[in-house]
Amino acid sequence: MRVAVTGTPGTGKTSATEAFERGVADAFVGDGVDEVDDSEVIHLNDHVGTDRLYTGVDESRESLVADLDGIEAWLDERENAEDRKEAETLLVESHLAHLLPADRVVVLRCHPEELTRRLSERGVEKSKASENAESEALDTVLSEAVSRHGTESVYEVDTIDRTPTEVGEAIAAVVAGERAPSAGTVSYLEYFE
């Protein structure tokens, strides 16, 4: 099974999936849930540059333009590699993960004001942080995920007032099938008022 963990930059994808990797999944082992215990996490953004999974450079954003077809082929090849550990579940973490084939899609959400604060702490330019906050308020990633995968495969997780471990536990519940799909449960439209 392939699970996409996605969201606007700053929502906590990397922190939550790192918590998942550190052992959040172990809490589910006693329940006999092999999919959670036997998972592999791919931090996709780490591979876009190193594995040349891009088509060019966007000079205005100072970022690589991801090659989604190339990434899809790379993931398929990686899943089918003979020397790869046999994992029941492949978690793909990236702000682009929802644009790729997946059985389940976890969309992490964060209030735009908190998102702006997090991105500012990272040193992201104010204009870029504002752009991401507006994207979050408009449900951009959620809308794209639902459009591509349908509401029955999308699980929205609000990261406000949750630690990375708690968000990792929510991801583990999705992987284990212990959480119902929940697209459209979070709204930040008041951000524009």
PLM segments and residue spans:
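Conserved phosphate-donor/acceptor-positioning beta-strand/loop module used by diverse small-molecule
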Residues: 102-125, 132
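ATP-binding Walker
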Residues: 11
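ATP-dependent small-molecule kinase phosphotransfer cores
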Residues: 37-90, 96, 182
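Hydrophobic anchor at the beta1->P-loop junction of P-loop NTPases
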Residues: 5
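NTP-dependent small-molecule kinase module
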Residues: 147-193
